[in-house]
From Swiss-Prot:
Membrane topology category: Multi-pass membrane protein
Organism lineage: Eukaryota, Fungi, Dikarya, Ascomycota, Saccharomycotina
Protein name: Peroxisomal membrane protein PMP47B
Compartments where located: Peroxisome membrane
Primary gene name: PMP47B
Functional description taken from the UniProt entry: May have transport activity.
Solcar repeat coordinates: 6-120, 142-230, 239-369
Listed transmembrane segments: 12-32, 98-118, 204-224, 245-265, 310-330, 349-369
MF (Gene Ontology): ADP transmembrane transporter activity; AMP transmembrane transporter activity; ATP transmembrane transporter activity; coenzyme A transmembrane transporter activity; FAD transmembrane transporter activity; FMN transmembrane transporter activity; NAD transmembrane transporter activity
PROSITE patterns in the cross-refs: SOLCAR (PS50920)
Composition skew (Polar residues), residue ranges: 56-69
Entries under Gene3D superfamilies matching the protein: Mitochondrial carrier domain
Length: 419
């Protein structure tokens, strides 16, 4: 990183551009991981269809719209072969358009609020930096707590804002071939389709594990910031794009290992919201909540467990998204074991590390170009000497309106002069 000061929007646009490039390069790995995380549900559907076919002969396994991967443990290579056989190489890029749209918006929002929050915290911890200039140089990095706070704010805002995009992406990636109409839509059309046919709540399916996943960038960027500070202190130089590549990859490795179970849960919830109707979901919720403390056994076990009734009452009062996440996680543990939470981890680690490495590298390379464009735009619009915020934009529009409407010129100009 250079010692020059970069605008918050420069970081936002550079992050969005870096995300687009890195996602494009690693998207086939994203597809494999998503298939691995959600494959069990598709396998279960196929097994049921095979049983029905064997009983009455009314259904042929070959006529099923669901995946017909064998019942044995599925490797990543088998998933790859299945995708290539059924859909060709383009199957590895199902949902790419929505993923690019999602990562661009996510990174733009994240980096903007990360830089904005980080600089705000730095000004408050170092009041002397606010005298004479509003800019704060972050080349030595944020403290641990500042990194975590900035990551929490930026992560929460970006997750909530982009969750509908990722719901659409998961469905387009997994079900684009089987779902017909949904697979032919672009991201905005898919979101509108879900909104009209299933309601706005479905667009925020998986928001609870998504908010838990705010821990992922917090961990990643905290590690990145601290290692960046270490390099600046020890080597007496700024961080280069290659340094950023290595530090970003290492931070993502640690963050992904810690938060991967929530990534799997989120993918399961995105698929579950479409494959099961509301009545089945409500019935499953009631049955599962009653069976959780009993560990799947008979009623006598509830008497042996003095906390069963209390746990049931607590769970019944929790918000529906939290209960749904808890039930899905419990069923995965009971039916598939702990390993189900880490299915596809190897490919995900490879994808995440490469994606983070490319992201940090491209972001550093694009930062100078992005900053030059932003500052040129500011000079043209008259905002070069001020931070780019809502107040400046409003004043710019006021000035423009005054130029077009002479009657309002005498009322608005004095207001700006007073400030």
């Amino acid at each position: 990183m250079s010692s020059r000061e970069y605008d918050d929007l420069s970081h936002a646009f550079a992050g969005a551009g870096g995300g687009l490039l890195s996602m494009t390069l690693t998207y086939p790995l994203v597809t494999l991981t998503t298939h691995a995380q959600t494959m069990v549900r598709l396998k279960k559907n196929e097994e049921e269809e095979k049983e029905n076919s064997n009983e009455d002969g009314s259904l042929s396994p070959k006529s099923s719209n669901t995946s017909n991967i064998s019942q044995k443990k599925i490797s990543q290579f088998e998933i790859l072969k299945k995708i290539l056989k059924d859909q060709g190489a383009k199957g590895l890029y199902n949902g790419l358009e929505s993923a690019l749209f999602g990562i661009a918006v996510t990174n733009f929002v994240y980096y903007y609020f990360y830089e904005l929050t980080g600089k705000t915290l730095s000004r408050r911890s170092n009041p002397q930096t606010t005298s004479g200039s509003k800019k704060v140089t972050l080349k030595k990095g944020l403290s641990v707590w500042q990194s975590m706070a900035a990551g929490a704010v930026a992560g929460t805002i970006s997750r909530v804002a982009t969750n509908p995009i990722w719901v659409a992406n998961t469905r387009m990636t997994i079900l684009s071939k089987n779902q017909g109409k949904l697979g032919k839509l672009n991201t905005i059309e898919a979101i509108i389709y879900i909104l009209k046919n299933e309601g706005w709540q479905k667009l925020f399916t998986g928001i609870v594990p998504a908010l838990f996943l705010v821990l992922n960038p917090i961990i990643q960027y905290t590690i990145f910031e601290q290692l960046k500070s270490f390099i600046v202190k020890i080597k007496k130089r700024n961080v280069t794009p290659v340094d950023a590549l290595l530090l970003g990859a290492f931070g993502k490795l640690i963050a992904t290992i810690i938060t991967y179970p929530y990534i799997t849960l989120r993918s399961r919830m995105h698929v579950k919201s479409m494959t099961e109707n509301n009545e089945d979901s409500e019935k499953e919720r009631t049955d599962s909540v009653q069976s959780l403390p009993e560990d799947g056994s008979d009623e006598d076990n509830s008497k042996e467990n003095p906390y069963a009734e209390t746990i049931n009452k607590i769970i019944s009062k929790l918000p529906s998204p939290i209960v749904s996440m808890f039930i899905i996680g419990y069923k995965m543990y009971k039916e598939e074991g702990v390993s189900s939470f880490y299915r596809g981890l190897s490919v995900k680690l490879l994808q995440s590390i490469l994606n983070a490495a490319f992201l940090f590298y491209f972001k550093e390379e694009l930062l100078i170009l992005s900053d030059a464009i932003i500052k040129s735009t500011k000079r043209v619009t008259g905002l070069a000497n001020n931070p780019y915020n809502a107040k400046d934009v409003i004043h710019s529009f006021e000035k423009a309106l005054c130029m077009r409407n002479p009657r309002s010129r005498t009322t608005t100009v004095p207001q700006t002069n007073e400030e």
